[in-house]
Amino acid sequence: MAIKKLLIASLLFSSATVYGADGFVVKDIHFEGLQRVAVGAALLSMPVRVGDTIGDDDIGNTIRALFATGNFEDVRVLRDGETLIVQVKERPTIASVTFSGNKSVKDDMLKENLEASGVRVGEALDRTALTSIEKGLEDFYYSVGKYSASVKAVVTPLPRNRVDLKLVFTEGVSAKIQQINIVGNKAFSSDELISRFQLRDEVPWWNVVGDRKYQKQKLSGDLETLRSFYLDRGYARFNIDSTQVSLTPDKKGIYITINMTEGEQYKLSGVAVKGNLAGHSAEIEGLTKVEPGELYNGTKVTRMEEDIKKLLGRYGYAYPRVVTQPEINDADKTVRLNINVDAGNRFYVRHVRFDGNDTSKDTVLRREMRQMEGAWLGNDLVEQGKERLNRLGYFESVEVETQRVPGVADQVDVTYKVKERNTGTFNFGVGFGTESGVSFQAGVQQDNWLGTGNSVGISGTKNDYQTYVELSLTDPYFTVDGVSLGGRVFYNKFEASDADLSDYTNVSYGVGSTLGFPINENNSLRVGLDYVHNDLSDMRPQVSMWRYLDSVGVNPSVVGENVKSSADFKANDFFLNTGWSYNNLDRGYFPTKGTRASANAKIAVPGSDNEYYKLTFDSASYYPLTESGKWVVMGRTRAGFADGIGSKEVPFYDNFYAGGSSTVRGFQSNTIGPKAAYYKCPANLVGSGFNSYSGCPIDSTNMDDAVGGNAMAVLSAELIVPTPFISDKYANSVRTSFFVDGGTVWDTNWENTAETLKAGVPDYGKATNFRVSSGIALQWMSPLGPLVFSYAQPVKKYDGDKSEQFQFNIGKTW
């Protein structure tokens, strides 16, 4: 016992050694206090083994080694004869980790940070680490302006040397900026400078960017904004001397003072480009031209550097170094730009790889590549491949990396990392309006069938007035050169009278095929043939309908009022279709920049029962207002025109319509434009030699049924904004926009007669009867499929128009 006490004293006070100069030989090692840690694991962590001769240094190393495992709070080493006794106190095991009071920081983020610090369920608790964790979390709150915040770790002991760990947060309130002072500005007012900041001491109601809540990171960004503002206006000697952030005694107010030196404005005296230009000096000099007397501009200097890097990157110089050293002449207030360029090595591409395409086949991605293996690297070609993959619409995100090949000086591998989205959808649409009630439609579409890139779809509608089924198939790479082949088969039974359209029934079916030919990266042409059969019956006498029938030589007999004509009409038509498409959108879903446009034409070829042509145009352009693409303006234009050939008219069943979620939101589908003007022939005239509807009066009591027209124009403008309360993780899956829609449909062949004027029928030949609506839309690419909601209120409407304020579509995705 005396030996044990003496050994403890020597370890604690290091005043003497009990082992003598030669130490002693360890015959056995015995542990006391082990519970969770196995004896074998403890022995492996020690530098001492049975049979070793040890001294004071070995004992010290043993204690340090055991502490280094992180499993023990206390370690003592004692000697009992030739047995080494190791007494330990294990750190308690964490049984649970909980949080309380944290509103600004999510539990998942806290757990992730704690685990990075070694604090997780099932691990030993290091009490010393809790202090630094508390301080680190409090520092985070201070950085976002919550200076009264506190974080306390509460450890509750449990049986079997376990503990519950609970972090208790008292967040407090964010300190608000009371005043921002700028000292040293002469050329520009403080108000003008502060107006460019995110942090503000005053925020008007319309400013959705400004913030009075102090955040250290935002202040750093505002200081950089201030620096760039002056450097872009020629103040080459501008400097921020100091920044003071003062806190009020109650920790609820912040005063910010920025001390700066403006200096004088400097002009550019010239640009000198030196170094290894890889034989592209003429092109580089063209990128660095400046006008005589031009003010120094920091942003322009940065742009020059980036342009030089992009230029060299196009020729395979993947890692050029471009450094600009401004040579400032204070005497004449000029700056000479010395641009040093080192193009570095030129690289070949060894492999182009794809990662993350679990469904899509490699060939589907590889055929979109413009950067070839074995060729010189071209950064523009690599980026072009990324854009083309994004444009497919198969992927939620596409990233690209260029990595050097180890041990090879002039080769790189290009890897595209994709995150696939669900491209198969079973969807149905629902609409609700005060006049229309509820309507439904359904469809199945797989845009990347079995990962082949082929599109297969079947869509259908079944309701009170329509039974419609369509099967479609498109192979975008029917040939290796990118010629596409598409086809469709459809069947449609349509009872227009039940759809608030003019009275008739049409049973139609058809088949069609289209070939597409790429012209360049963004343009393509297509040509196709269609066959369509239409079987019309139950046609109620109506002005534009009877005008068409008369043009094709069908003259129904006159019947009395409230009796439908017994006239039937069948048409077999063959159409030649041609079209042009342009697309340079940055991605297929939720684009932020670029334009998509298409123009199409179809004409009935000889041998058809009808003779007419139809033209359509559709264009949508996106203009980002911010570099992040969170604020975007979108404009869309749709137009159409159709006309008969010779004395023939356009079939009334192939008219243009507008209204609904795809054209003018806020209006019921297809209800904008000309309405039916039904003939109402008196019964006493029928059968008395009266054989023409032209002399019958018009029923002025029933003019609400839409008939469409042969011309259409629809305009839309949308402001796409960041969706509130959505984290950056889901920002690419949700889109919110405010919109204004406008559109009209008219009949260029309409002529008012004495009877139509008497009945008060409007002039349906006018193109100026524009309908307008405004509202808000929300689109969400949810795990269950695409969800689209819109609420719109008609701003300008006409008699007979039918509103449908709330519309949404719901889809199920596999």
From Swiss-Prot:
Q: Which GO terms describe its cellular component?
A: Bam protein complex
- Which Gene3D superfamilies does UniProt cross-reference here? membrane protein fhac (3.10.20.310), membrane protein fhac: a member of the omp85/tpsb transporter family (2.40.160.50)
Signal peptide residues are 1-20
Q: Name one GO biological process term.
A: protein insertion into membrane
Cellular compartment(s): Cell outer membrane
Q: Does the keyword NADP apply?
A: no
Domain spans labelled POTRA: 24-91, 92-172, 175-263, 266-344, 347-421
* Claim: S-adenosyl-L-methionine is one of the keywords in the record: no
Keyword annotations of the record? Cell outer membrane, Membrane, Repeat, Signal, Transmembrane, Transmembrane beta strand
What Pfam families does the entry give?
A: Omp85 (PF01103), POTRA (PF07244)
Q: What is the similarity comment for this entry?
A: Belongs to the BamA family.
Q: How does it assemble?
A: Part of the Bam complex, which is composed of the outer membrane protein BamA, and four lipoproteins BamB, BamC, BamD and BamE.
HAMAP family annotated for this entry?
A: OM_assembly_BamA
Q: What function is annotated for this protein?
A: Part of the outer membrane protein assembly complex, which is involved in assembly and insertion of beta-barrel proteins into the outer membrane. Constitutes, with BamD, the core component of the assembly machinery.
Q: What is this protein called?
A: Outer membrane protein assembly factor BamA
